Amino acid sequence: MSHEELNDQLRVRREKLKKIEELGVDPFGKRFERTHKAEELFELYGDLSKEELEEQQIEVAVAGRIMTKRGMGKAGFAHIQDVTGQIQIYVRQDDVGEQQYELFKISDLGDIVGVRGTMFKTKVGELSIKVSSYEFLTKALRPLPEKYHGLKDIEQRYRQRYLDLIMNPESKKTFITRSLIIQSMRRYLDSHGYLEVETPMMHAVAGGAAARPFITHHNALDMTLYMRIAIELHLKRLIVGGLEKVYEIGRVFRNEGISTRHNPEFTMLELYEAYADFRDIMKLTENLIAHIATEVLGTTKIQYGEHLVDLTPEWRRLHMVDAIKEYVGVDFWRQMSDEEARELAKEHGVEVAPHMTFGHIVNEFFEQKVEDKLIQPTFIYGHPVEISPLAKKNPDDPRFTDRFELFIVGREHANAFTELNDPIDQRQRFEEQLKEREQGNDEAHEMDEDFLEALEYGMPPTGGLGIGVDRLVMLLTNSPSIRDVLLFPQMRHK
């Protein structure tokens, strides 16, 4: 639609607004009591014959947005849409009277109306409502996008999500499914004895992950604060305090790039369980995700893009070093210097930064050469100690940690470990991170004295888990971009 056409439409719609007022009707309506939603009408009455509907004279009241409209004269049809779908209405001047029929005639696509009437089927067998009362509820002053040309622009769908929800039933379905996924997640955890808690979103120290924070300032306290990059360290304090199984589903903020997999604010599930380790958390993770898929989708076998993914437990478990050996043919089990690791990286075309040591290079091999090949659910465990400052070292090979990440369709979906509960070791790890920061790693962890003090009171052996909720929703709704599963994703200025 050209700018000129839009301006014409806006003018015409404002003129119609005046006409509605001249008829003594409030163009922005009032409360309307519905008996049914569109989908319920099909469920209840869709199988009845024309004759049965005629005989039963079923009275209903529905409300929604006009999506199609045809026929004028003394009778017309329209489809109105509510959250569940569309139902056809049939409006006849003889049934509703002159004033209400005039209202119907001047109604535009996008206007919101309420109707009362009886159920019937048209000649072609379409379930419809024969309207006896037509009530105007909201005048739309802007036209909806044209059905077949209007909302193909993906950027407009993200910027004006309300139009996307009106015009694209698939989009609405995705967001309803998202809500069901989070409800199912909560139900599972609540029924397994986990306590849902809420912890601060503004932190004095940015910790719990390798990421750049958003920085803000508290005027009254005159102090710098960081929007949380993880929920982890506050939940661990609660484990110290004796709350043995805790979780939080909440927003996390990372001041980083935007991509099909990354948005600066996103939703995480973080969970901690005292007296558990990372292997217990593996079992919990596969059972939780399989439960959600079964409850929400009715199956653990799902389509994602070109892949058929089987979420049925038990999932594959593979050490990071073995994964590199399997997919690249390089063996990092043998002892080697940082320099030898660097040479291997050069040989295999793996890019490494100046501050990187043996463990970082192992991780780079995995991320650059293996990660995107892991289509079926796979737990990759045994991450190097250098990239896991909050995880317990593996007792058999202290170069690695008791940590895992879950990969499905080549993407990380969860991160978990046997938590580091030794405050002396934790302090040393933080000190190593500070050295990395000095060498140019701006994602290295800061020193957190308050957290160290909490650990010194004694935290029991603990297993912890973080699941990216948005990525899980992408997987379970077959959505290619994170922006397809966020109602209002972050966008650049127009």
UniProtKB/Swiss-Prot annotation:
CDD domains: LysRS_core, LysRS_N. It holds the Pfam family tRNA_anti-codon. Its cofactor is Mg(2+). Binds 3 Mg(2+) ions per subunit. It is found in: Cytoplasm. InterPro entries: Aa-tRNA-synt_II, aa-tRNA-synth_II, aa-tRNA-synth_II/BPL/LPL, Lys-tRNA-ligase_II, Lys-tRNA-ligase_II_bac/euk, Lys-tRNA-ligase_II_N, Lys-tRNA-synth_II_C, NA-bd_OB-fold. SUPFAM superfamilies: Class II aaRS and biotin synthetases, Nucleic acid-binding proteins. Mg(2+) 1 binds at residues 405, 412. One of its GO terms (biological process) is lysyl-tRNA aminoacylation. It catalyses: tRNA(Lys) + L-lysine + ATP = L-lysyl-tRNA(Lys) + AMP + diphosphate. Its main location: cytoplasm. Mg(2+) 2 binds at residue 412. PROSITE patterns: AA_TRNA_LIGASE_II. GO terms for cellular component: cytosol. Keywords: Aminoacyl-tRNA synthetase, ATP-binding, Cytoplasm, Ligase, Magnesium, Metal-binding, Nucleotide-binding, Protein biosynthesis. Its EC number is 6.1.1.6. GO terms for molecular function: ATP binding; catalytic activity, acting on a protein; lysine-tRNA ligase activity; magnesium ion binding; transferase activity; tRNA binding. Homodimer. Belongs to the class-II aminoacyl-tRNA synthetase family. This is Lysine--tRNA ligase.
